Amino acid sequence: MNLRIGHGYDVHKFGDSGPITICGVKIDYEQGLLAHSDGDVALHALCDALLGALALGDIGGHFPDTDAQFKGADSRALLRHVMTLVNEHGYEIGNLDLTIVAQAPKMAPHIQAMRENIRQDVNAQLNQVNVKATTTEKLGFAGRKEGIACYAVVLLNKSIAA
């Protein structure tokens, strides 16, 4: 197969004091996200999408929250590891698109830094990486400011070198 599509989703609830980390960007906020790792909901969704595209399971199977070595783990490092698997299977990024669902904090001021971090970690061009954010108009858990969710979609292309 020359093309593979993956979809990922993750959610973390708010808990302790902030800041939060989204796409490797630290964002000041009154609460942090509860998680075994750094709680980067967007990069977790992206890792799931990449793993799913290659039928390699999910982030929990590769980085279990029962394993102490992943306590407080930097999700950018997890993403880079997942990308080594993508490359070892002979694929590269075609494009990726993330949708962050959060009533607060506002993501817009941080979107370009998020895109740049991802671009670096997946070895892609900036025009292959899209990150956007939306609210739920105060509906549901995100609207009540109980947590943040993220959806990720990726298209992988067979590498020319493969």
UniProtKB/Swiss-Prot annotation:
Q: In which pathway does it act?
A: Isoprenoid biosynthesis; isopentenyl diphosphate biosynthesis via DXP pathway; isopentenyl diphosphate from 1-deoxy-D-xylulose 5-phosphate: step 4/6
Listed under subunit, the entry gives: Homotrimer.
User: Which family would the database say this protein is a member of?
Assistant: Belongs to the IspF family.
Q: What residues does the record give for site: Transition state stabilizer?
A: 36, 135
Residues that hold a divalent metal cation according to the record: 10, 12, 44
Which GO biological process entries does UniProt record here?
isopentenyl diphosphate biosynthetic process, methylerythritol 4-phosphate pathway; terpenoid biosynthetic process
TM stretches of this protein: none
Q: Which HAMAP family match?
A: IspF
Organism equals Pseudoalteromonas atlantica (strain T6c / ATCC BAA-1087)
* Cofactor needs: a divalent metal cation
Question: What domain of life does the UniProt record list for this protein's source?
Answer: Bacteria
Query: What is catalyzed by this enzyme?
Result: 4-CDP-2-C-methyl-D-erythritol 2-phosphate = 2-C-methyl-D-erythritol 2,4-cyclic diphosphate + CMP
Q: Which residues bind 4-CDP-2-C-methyl-D-erythritol 2-phosphate?
A: 10-12, 36-37, 58-60, 63-67, 102-108, 134-137, 141, 144
Enzyme nomenclature, EC number = 4.6.1.12
What this chain does, per the entry, is described as:
Involved in the biosynthesis of isopentenyl diphosphate (IPP) and dimethylallyl diphosphate (DMAPP), two major building blocks of isoprenoid compounds. Catalyzes the conversion of 4-diphosphocytidyl-2-C-methyl-D-erythritol 2-phosphate (CDP-ME2P) to 2-C-methyl-D-erythritol 2,4-cyclodiphosphate (ME-CPP) with a corresponding release of cytidine 5-monophosphate (CMP).
As one GO molecular function, the record gives: 2-C-methyl-D-erythritol 2,4-cyclodiphosphate synthase activity
Q: Which gene encodes it?
A: ispF
- Cofactor: binding details: Binds 1 divalent metal cation per subunit.
Protein known as: 2-C-methyl-D-erythritol 2,4-cyclodiphosphate synthase
